[in-house]
Amino acid sequence: MKRLLLPLLAIAAATPLMAQNERAPFVIEETGRTFWRLDDAVKSIGEGQGTIVIGPGQFKECAVQAAGSITYRAAQPGSVIFDGVACDGKAALVFRGIFARVEGIIFQNIRVPDRNGSGIRLEKGDLEEDNSIFRNSEQGILTNEGPTMNVKVDRSTFSGLGGCPDGMCSHSLYIGNNASLSVTNSRFEKGTGGHYLKSRAAMTQISGNSFDDTRGRTTNYHIDLPAGSGGSITKNVFVQGRDKENYSAIIALGAEERIHRSVGLVIAGNDVSIAPGIDRETTFIGDWTHEPLRIGQNKIGPGVKLSDQR
């Protein structure tokens, strides 16, 4: 069995529940002001710029950032958990400002009536997310349509996410028609339906990630770029598991519509295989665009065809 990329998170050995202590858990780094509720800390920054440092704890709360530029940082990576609460029926953190950055936070058990419960919902502005975990929810990160929005994800884990219970699907990471998406050094695993990464962004960089489907259930594509995309998919490890709703391809390009040009999309340096003990065939790149791609050297395992046009 080949070695897969391991999560790069520095997780605390034990995560304490929110305790009664003398110091409020939400601290504005620039001023030292403290708050007992995250939403109050966010509102205190308003249209300005600031960093909220979050003390260890498991929090049954959420927040909406309506303006400004805010960084949300765990004082100790992996010691902060947002558990089971979504604002506006959407996510633990809903972003409608200019910019948001999230560092070292765990999001879990988030479910809402429309089955799009997410750790992060980006409705406006740019997002940078680093060193976090999204687990056992309907979705990890979901973004609205927004052709000027940019999303960067680094060193993070997406586990136990997604589903298509009635044909309306959620995915581990779902990006709308945005300007760009970058996903690096991250791990996708144990999907519970839908795709691991679905993006309608015009430009895509997906590099150095692990897509481990060996314990997935009723999953579909590892990467779905349904509207086409430029950019690159490089140096990733893909393993297709047994329990698939659709095992016809690892990467799907332009399967729904062609909004963005895919000419020159680089797909190289990837390691692609079907999990041991599974006797079937699949295709690494299912291409509906018929545009000239730049497919370089990839390590392709038994039963995997490099590409086909559909």
State where each predicted segment sits.
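Surface-exposed or flexible loop/turn and strand-edge residues in extracellular/cell-surface modules
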Residues: 23, 49, 56-61, 67, ...
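Bacterial N-terminal signal peptides that target proteins for export
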Residues: 1-6
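Right-handed parallel beta-helix
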Residues: 55-56, 69, 73-79, 99-109, ...
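Acidic Gly/Asp/Thr-rich repetitive segments characteristic of extracellular carbohydrate-active
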Residues: 22-61
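Extracellular beta-strand/beta-solenoid scaffold signature
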Residues: 84-93, 113-121, 136-145, 165-175, ...
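N-terminal signal peptide c-region/cleavage motif recognized by signal peptidases
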Residues: 14-16
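Leucine-rich solenoid repeat scaffolds
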Residues: 279-310
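Extracellular beta-strand-rich solenoid/capping regions of secreted or surface-exposed proteins
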Residues: 43-47, 59-73, 81-103, 108-125, ...
